């Protein structure tokens, strides 16, 4: 639907767009019912009331229909804001980080409830977020933006597993980076050679991989030199620090060959002492090679 061009403009109130603000922006002087019904301008009074009750029942807040925003918790206010945005049956919903003001446990529950309601309503949604988990959890399609431009767009799995540059990798998680030079369509690193098809010889590239794809050889930890494999994928490193993060441990290493820092995530509890010697490998099928000028 065209809403604006050089000679034509639809007023905002007639664009059939729902908007859900980051801070909910409920009207404090209006009841819950009047907040939800604020955008309902058509239909009889009975029809508008029925729509208000339908939405409040759907968000499990019908009991607060005559209450006021200050009587509600943050999660309840969020659900009222959702009902208000959906009441006029918009063609599209714009959501500006609507869950950022909620605590973590409540945020997960509210996100799932909101997604279910939006699916039931059949409303298209454009959601703005800086949270990668939220994007993966909510979206059918993700668009990554940088400097006001879309740099990558696609299904969550594709965007995560086929990033277009270093910054796209880093949006979803911490990223380890190895700098290398290409020779004969191969990038040569301490972890061996990586394919760099179509990249001219002499080009500097970054090999980028996530911490969960840096692997520790536990059988050789703290022992003598590891026999080098045919492509030289094993590398020696020293533990700088280790932290328990709840479901996993984060271990930071200083690489022997150049003093660079790499990070690995390990399931459960793994807290080696600083100074411990480890041998590392990477999952080569989970590494991405980007020319430095396109590293993001």
Language model segments and positions:
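ABC ATPase NBD Q-loop/coupling interface
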Residues: 1-16, 45
């Amino acid at each position: 639907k065209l809403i604006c061009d050089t000679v034509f403009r639809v007023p905002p109130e007639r664009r059939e767009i729902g908007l859900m603000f980051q801070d909910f922006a409920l009207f404090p002087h209006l009841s819950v019912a009047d907040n939800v019904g604020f955008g309902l301008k058509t239909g009889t009074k009975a029809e508008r009331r029925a729509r208000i009750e339908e939405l409040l029942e759907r968000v499990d807040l019908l009991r607060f229909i005559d209450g006021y925003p200050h009587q509600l918790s943050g999660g309840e206010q969020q659900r009222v804001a959702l009902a208000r945005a959906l009441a006029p049956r918009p063609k599209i919903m714009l959501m500006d980080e609507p869950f950022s003001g909620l605590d973590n446990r409540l945020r997960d529950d509210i996100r799932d409830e909101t997604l279910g309601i939006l699916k039931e309503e059949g409303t298209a949604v454009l959601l703005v977020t800086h949270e990668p988990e939220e994007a993966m959890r909510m979206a059918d399609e993700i668009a990554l933006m940088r400097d006001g431009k879309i740099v990558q767009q696609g299904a969550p799995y594709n965007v995560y597993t086929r990033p277009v540059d270093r910054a796209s990798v880093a949006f979803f998680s911490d990223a380890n980076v190895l700098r290398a030079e290409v020779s004969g369509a191969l990038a040569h690193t301490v972890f061996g050679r990586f394919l760099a098809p179509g990249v001219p010889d002499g080009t500097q590239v970054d090999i980028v991989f996530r911490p969960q794809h840096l692997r520790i050889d536990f059988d050789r930890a703290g022992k003598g030199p590891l026999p080098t494999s045919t492509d030289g994928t094993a590398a020696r490193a020293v533990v700088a620090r280790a932290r328990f993060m709840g479901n996993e441990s984060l271990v930071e290493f200083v690489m022997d060959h150049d003093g660079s820092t790499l990070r690995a995530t390990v399931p459960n509890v793994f807290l080696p002492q600083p100074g411990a010697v480890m041998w590392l490998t990477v999952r080569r099928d989970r590494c991405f090679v980007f020319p430095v000028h396109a590293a993001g």
